[in-house]
Amino acid sequence: MSPKVQALLLLVGLITFLEVHAEEELSETVESERSCAKEYQWCDWNTRPCCDNISCICSWIGTNCECKKGIICTIKDWYKGK
């Protein structure tokens, strides 16, 4: 086998390996993002709670739920520079 063919096969193998590894990392990231909602994202008490002890606030009829920090947490974050 010529060196060019060997180099090509090595390159194709490396690209395939990197692609599979990237897909695994992406699926882990997507799964962790689904587990909880960040501030100002939609939430549901049963299926998608808020991250970082943020409250899930809903409209008066129980729809349009959104993760929101209370005023005290907002002031603390502002004071800490977050």
UniProtKB/Swiss-Prot annotation:
It is found in: Secreted. Disulfide bonds join C36-C51, C43-C56, C50-C67, C58-C65. Expressed by the venom gland. GO terms for cellular component: extracellular region. GO terms for molecular function: ion channel inhibitor activity; toxin activity. CDD domains: Spider_toxin (cd12960). Pfam families: Toxin_9. Residues 1-22 form the signal peptide. Keywords: Disulfide bond, Knottin, Secreted, Signal, Toxin. The keyword Manganese does not apply. Its main location: secreted. Residues 23-34 form a propeptide. Belongs to the neurotoxin 02 (plectoxin) family. 04 (U16-lycotoxin) subfamily. The presence of a 'disulfide through disulfide knot' structurally defines this protein as a knottin. This is U16-lycotoxin-Ls1b. The lineage of its organism: Eukaryota, Metazoa, Ecdysozoa, Arthropoda, Chelicerata.
